[in-house]
Amino acid sequence: MVKMLVLYYSAYGHMEQMAKAAAEGAREGGAEVTLKRVPELVPEEVAKASHYKIDQEAPIATPGELADYDAIIIGTATRYGMMASQMKNFLDQTGGLWAKGALINKVGSVMVSTATQYGGAELALISTQWQMQHHGMIIVPLSYAYREQMGNDVVRGGAPYGMTTTADGDGSRQPSAQELDGARFQGRRVAEITAKLHG
């Protein structure tokens, strides 16, 4: 059975919801899934004053454990068109894994949330994939296999590179049913492709 980690950073709970949906989809695809988050770097008083969602139930991951999984889906909030510093800080601690080639041929996939529809989602998806490529991971994107990302009738999440959601600048918009469905699709797709590669 494929062992998968869904690893996320979420300040306001949007990516937490997307990560849970991706984990559901991966389980539907036959994977054994672990859901974890990266540590918060913002001081607690600042996080509280900014109304961060600090009661997230997912346990904190450690960089060394990434080698224990066949596939890793990273979900991250974005800052100015890049992954949030919390996720970057975590990934910057994986140099030891890189030196040993511990993640070579593992499967990787990415999801992001942005404040606006054009808030750098595709750049953040691709630049996060770069981190995985430096580790020799095999990237499995959302792709246009997920057709529900098409259309302009409503705000839709998704890009060929990975699933996206839009939170609005004040965080008031929650992931839509379509975006959660896309996260489930991506999780299931990654599980099924990983099973073919590592089964």
Curated annotation (Swiss-Prot):
Positions of substrate binding: W98
First-level EC class: oxidoreductase
Binding site for NAD(+): Y12
GO MF, one annotated term: NAD binding
All copies of domain Flavodoxin-like, residue ranges: 4-190
Cofactor list: FMN
Catalyzed reactions per annotation: a quinone + NADH + H(+) = a quinol + NAD(+); a quinone + NADPH + H(+) = a quinol + NADP(+)
Coiled-coil annotated spans: none
GO CC, one annotated term: membrane
Co-factor binding comment: Binds 1 FMN per monomer.
Region described as Disordered: spans on this chain: 161-181
EC code: 1.6.5.2
Residues noted as binding FMN in the record, renumbered to the chain: 10-15, 78-80, 113-119, 134
Regions of compositional bias (Polar residues) in chain numbering: 163-177
Alphabetical UniProt keywords: Flavoprotein, FMN, NAD, NADP, Nucleotide-binding, Oxidoreductase
Similarity annotation: Belongs to the WrbA family.
UniProt protein name: NAD(P)H dehydrogenase (quinone)
